[in-house]
A protein has these predicted regions:
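Intrinsically disordered, low-complexity regulatory segments enriched in Ser/Thr/Pro
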Residues: 3, 77-128
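Contiguous, amphipathic alpha-helical segments that mediate oligomerization or scaffolding
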Residues: 15-59
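Amphipathic alpha-helical interaction segments
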Residues: 24, 45, 69, 99, ...
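Generic hydrophobic secondary-structure signal
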Residues: 45, 49-52, 56, 76-78, ...
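Ser/Thr-rich, low-complexity intrinsically disordered terminal regions
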Residues: 61-84
Length: 142
């Protein structure tokens, strides 16, 4: 085999192996991210939202915290009894970015709160964001 042909084949193989390794690392990183989110969702987000929900329910508000079985997202809905509108806040994975996207929808507006790395999703963060959301919801009633 000619040397230039041999080198071309070896270069193509090396390029493939490099891309394949990068893809495998990307898949491992995504698995780590999804696993990390599953743990944070169960041990941080849901308990933090439930703590807020207890306080709101005691004050007469309807508050539902839901986590999908197949969908890894979380949704919290807060509304006053008999209200037609059911404002909600969601936590959804942005797998391409390895972040969690938080959206909020109230009677007046719907917009992303932002995208956050897993290490930003703490109990304090979750409760602060849902409190801001509730403040908006409460101010729009009446």
């Amino acid at each position: 085999m000619r040397k230039d042909v041999q080198e071309a084949i070896e270069n193509a193989i090396a390029g493939f192996e490099k891309r394949h390794q990068a893809e495998q690392e990307r898949l491992r990183e995504r698995e780590r991210f999804e696993s990390g989110w599953a743990q944070i969702r169960t041990t941080v987000v849901l308990p933090a939202l439930e703590e807020v929900a207890v306080v709101l329910r005691k004050a007469g508000w309807q508050c539902e915290v839901r986590a999908g079985e197949k969908d890894p997202g979380v949704q919290v809905t807060i509304y006053w009894e008999g209200g037609g509108e059911k404002p909600f806040m969601t936590y959804q994975l942005e797998k391409q970015k390895n972040t969690v996207l938080i959206n909020a929808a109230t009677k007046a507006s719907a917009a992303p709160v932002g995208s956050f790395a897993l290490d930003k999703i703490t109990e304090d963060f979750v409760q602060t964001e849902v409190t801001k959301f509730f403040t908006r919801v409460a101010s729009e009633i009446g």
